[in-house]
Amino acid sequence: MIIETFDNTTQEVLKELEKTQKQFWNISRTTAEFLYNIIVDSKAKSVVEVGTSNGYSGIWLGKALKKTGGRLTTIEFYDKRLDVAKENFEKCGVADIIETKRGDAATILEYLPEDFKIDIAFVDANKSQYIKFFEFIKPHLNVGGYIACDNVISHAAKVQ
């Protein structure tokens, strides 16, 4: 398992965050490992996460990006969640490669600099805005890049 390759502190933080999965709407470990592998296998350098929450997925993305020499830009609307995430990024040794943005994701994505390029985008936020997020991310996506959206099947009615 990938988690066993992480330092003890990161393993402990991730296991604690897994206990709050429903409260903070975190992805499953299986999904986290899948995203980790996509980043490492594709040698992604620029990843954007929409929906930071408490940082669970961001830690996984950050650990993968440490292997590829990349950076993560993560966006969260709620102040308290982003503050918790920042603490978790520090504890897990990924804060140095993560840029956090606080605010409305659609607005932040809409006004990304024209030359901002994305290898992989992971969207796990307000389901009713997924199509809008996609439209703002697509012009920045590098050839061969990926956009992964969580809950598109389980929350299909909200995504449309």
Please report, for each region that a protein language model flagged, where it lies by residue.
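A short alpha-helical cap/connector motif
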Residues: 1-122, 127-148, 152-160
